[in-house]
Amino acid sequence: MFATPLRQPAAANHQTPKNSAGMDEHGKPYQYEITDHGYGKDAVKVLHVSRNGPVHAIQEFEVGTHLKLYSKKDYYQGNNSDIVATDSQKNTVYLLAKKHGIESPEKFALLLARHFINKYSHVEEAHVHVEAYPWQRVCQEETRTNVNGKCENGVQGNCDFSSIDNRSLHNHAFIFTPTALHYCDVVIRRTDPKQTVITGIKGLRVLKTTQSSFVNFVNDEFRSLPDQYDRIFSTVVDCSWEYSDTENLDFLRAWQTVKNIIIRNFAGDPQVGVSSPSVQHTLYLSERQVLDVLPQVSVISMTMPNKHYFNFDTKPFQKIAPGDNNEVFIPVDKPHGTIYAQLARKNINSHL
């Protein structure tokens, strides 16, 4: 299944249609019923190249398509007459990419989900998951050649590789920059006029060396951690949000906006930073600002594991390294604290 499943069976809302239970080969009903089902194709990898003259653009996706059929006869009787083969679903990904192009994970997922619902009347629900590979255009200054401290013959432009001009972008060369993963989930149900569009950020790893504290927490017989007035704060952010309105929405710009908001609330001003009294507070400020800035977002969920960096104790080694140590730390990724919260506008029903 998908890394981020959207829907879980809800027993309270589940209504079993009459005669939905399976029949055996003698026409007698089984004593069990299928309460959830579906099938699909996962890990379909596609690269789309947009060739606009000499300037090319690329999108590389990993796509999963899952369908839920009205009928369960493929399970109960082994009757495959309603099955849209997973190989056909794979082909659909490539053919729609060829026919319509690829602009963003969300738009492509919506295109695929609508296709399955519109083309196959026996499909009850279509769920599409897309993960975007983080390619960025190479800066021209990164392609200059330097030999023995001098520019190679025939190479024009600045050969100072310590300074990269981000405005000079290469026409057709790209570099893989896995800072964070952009993914989305789209669910369209034939009986529900509202489509579900969820976008997410996965694996955004950040660290700051000061302006983080953790003090005045519960002090009892189980506590061993002292108050920390200045510590290293590092986390790997996973975040997802649901759109209530996608009309004329620039999905790529919205995703970048959320990412920038998270980084800004974590890091603060480049010169002075921002104080983080707890991971919880930083997380909440990020979520609140997303809802303030993007009215199309109805609910946002975020997880921030606390990746610890502990001071190496130099006290037993004063002859070798005298004085206090605030420069050498031991990274400890396990065990780690995990902080999460979901922030929603009032009176919102979410699929997060």
UniProtKB/Swiss-Prot annotation:
Catalytic activity reported: urate + O2 + H2O = 5-hydroxyisourate + H2O2
One CC-aspect GO term: peroxisome
Main location: other
One Pfam family cited in the UniProt record for this chain: Uricase
Tissue: Malpighian tubules.
PROSITE patterns to which the protein is assigned, alphabetical: URICASE
Pathway(s) this gene product operates in, as recorded in its UniProt entry: Purine metabolism; urate degradation; (S)-allantoin from urate: step 1/3
EC primary class: oxidoreductase
tRNA processing found in the keyword field: no
Gene3D superfamilies xref list: Urate Oxidase (3.10.270.10)
Residues that coordinate or bind urate: 86-87, 214, 231, 279-280, 306
Disordered as annotated region, ranges: 1-32
One annotated GO molecular function: urate oxidase activity
Motif Microbody targeting signal per UniProt: ranges: 350-352
Regulation of protein activity: Repressed by 20-hydroxyecdysone.
Family from the record: Belongs to the uricase family.
Chain's role: Catalyzes the oxidation of uric acid to 5-hydroxyisourate, which is further processed to form (S)-allantoin.
Protein name, per record: Uricase
Lineage: Eukaryota, Metazoa, Ecdysozoa, Arthropoda, Hexapoda
Gene from which the chain derives: Uro
